[in-house]
Amino acid sequence: MSRNFYNYDPTVDILQPPLIPDVILKSNLKELTLPTGNQVLESLPLTAWFHRTRSNIISHLTRYEAEWETQKSAARNELHSVKSYLKGNIFNDARELYALPETNILTICAYFAGRIITNRKNWGVSAATLQSVKSSVHRPSLMARVCTSIPSKMVLPWAMAGAVFKELAPTAFDNTITSLESDILDPGFVAQYKTLWRDYYTNGAKKASIEAAELLEGKLQGYIGFARNFIIYSTR
């Protein structure tokens, strides 16, 4: 008996076109024959969509990469400008620049010390909530109330940090104030606060304290001189 019992010839089936209408085949599909004899159908709209999507992705990636490189270059230039400005206008003292790490560490420690001082829990203020109603309620002292007030919380940590930085790096501190006044703050605001500083501090509180110290020193010297003369005349 023949192997092709139903008169089936596989070569004829391979060479026959697929069972697809000619309209669809001519408009949306493309038929390709591989070297092995297999037939492949390519969807032209799907291929066009893949090409279009691939081109858009490549275009977006190229644009984002160029923008990223531009931003990196701009950030690098800004960082270089900031370093040059700080080195030329703020930290222009070689001794202070050499000791800058220690100065920064101590300044940060002073800031956190101010935060600790202005924390209510460190003064025992919150202990009253843990006590019963019948027991005596813990009342904070005047110093605790002053240190834990809202103005103290806002000013004291920065004031302590500024005092330490001014003590360890006076030139850099003065240069920082000068740079803030000339490059960042408004000239009208600078002139106004300088006038207030001169009227109320330089010619006011500071002058009064200097005069009081000189008066007290003169009085003490007079009393010491009187006591010394009294002792001298008494021992004769």
Curated annotation (Swiss-Prot):
The chain crosses the membrane at residues 97-113, 146-165. The keyword Electron transport does not apply. Keywords: Membrane, Mitochondrion, Mitochondrion inner membrane, Transmembrane, Transmembrane helix. It is a multi-pass membrane protein. The keyword GTP-binding does not apply. It comes from the Eukaryota. One of its GO terms (biological process) is positive regulation of protein oligomerization. Residues 1-96, 166-236 are mitochondrial intermembrane. It is found in: Mitochondrion inner membrane. Residues 114-145 are mitochondrial matrix. One of its GO terms (cellular component) is mitochondrial crista junction. Belongs to the apolipoprotein O/MICOS complex subunit Mic27 family. Component of the MICOS complex, a large protein complex of the mitochondrial inner membrane that plays crucial roles in the maintenance of crista junctions, inner membrane architecture, and formation of contact sites to the outer membrane. Component of the mitochondrial contact site and cristae organizing system (MICOS) complex. This is MICOS complex subunit MIC27. The gene is MIC27.
